[in-house]
Amino acid sequence: MSRAHTTSGRFTVTSWDEKVIADIDGESTEINGVSYPKRGFSRADTTYAYSGDIEGTGIVAYLISYNPGFAPTSGFERFEGSIDGHDGSLVFQHVGDHDEQTVRATLHIVEGMGTGGLEGMTGEATVELAGHSDDGYDITLNYDL
């Protein structure tokens, strides 16, 4: 029998490799060697380190759109580690959006892709990031196991 749980942790970005796929207007801005189109989309290959009750690493492939104002993002992440003492791996589907100030996303656990103690886990996490932080970002996961 499954029970509802809520747990939390923090994550930091350990690598970010972003490349433009489409620059609609040919107008981009370069920041720290990365090009960001005014309108278009890119792919970012990213790794995260998690700590707290969610501990481990994540490898993410993002598709990020750029548009003045609201712009959607999506991606898939393979998480390996421990959630509330359950060791294994699972896959999150990231669905979100961003603007000039904030990134918002819901991370859905993809059913059927878990291993070990995380096999059979269902649920979702939410994140809202305002600006860059070297100290990491909070994540709260609601799950059933």
Predicted regions and their residues:
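Beta-strand-enriched cores of mature, soluble protein domains
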Residues: 2-145
